[in-house]
């Protein structure tokens, strides 16, 4: 067997990087790549924000509207949840709720950078909305309005968990024409070391598993970012 053949059959390819007088493994390079991607996205969102971004995405947004209206019609007023939970050390649920209310108590984030940068797929806050977002949901670019939900339909409120007594936010998500298509139910409870947090988005029951699973991951990225923002604000 030749040396080349032996190398090819010896197992997976790994890479070490030698630079700046040090050696780095691939996990470090992955982190550098992630940081670079975040910088690139931040630059793009800054340069092509607002109505410019809305115009660029218009066709995709219209397709997203049609997708969600079809889900609503197929669901007949029934729902299912996407749910992600967090165990937080060093920040109480009460402090997180105070921060969240100060930022989004009206349904509109006060610090737009914290909203846009919480997730790579937060494309733009529609400039004519008092609160809202264009983001990827179910593989579709989705434009929605956010408003505080003072009252919840009984099938939605049934998802609230009384063992999490601290409310972060209850919100209604509506399509551009005012059609309700989802609800946010975000709760927490204090622990001896910090908090336990559970965040839910309640979707029409016809939402496919891939959409629910994708949004569970979306919530993990988004709320980890906001938990870190809240912790930084309390220091």
Predicted regions and their residues:
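Generic detector of short, locally flexible boundary/turn motifs and exposed helical patches
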Residues: 17-22, 45-53, 61-63, 149-155, ...
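Histidine (H) residue identity feature
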Residues: 18, 60, 68, 119-122, ...
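Hydrophobic ligand-binding cavity/cleft-lining segments
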Residues: 35-127
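Surface-exposed beta-strand edges and their flanking turn/coil or helix-capping segments
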Residues: 99, 148-149, 210-214
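Glycine-rich portal/gate segments that line the openings of hydrophobic small-molecule binding cavities
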Residues: 107-110, 114-176
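Beta-strand/loop substructures that line and gate deep hydrophobic ligand-binding cavities in soluble
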Residues: 2-44, 166-225
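Short, highly charged C-terminal tails/helix-capping segments
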Residues: 230-235
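Hydrophobic/aromatic beta-strand elements that line small-molecule binding cavities or substrate pockets
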Residues: 86, 148-150, 156, 182-190
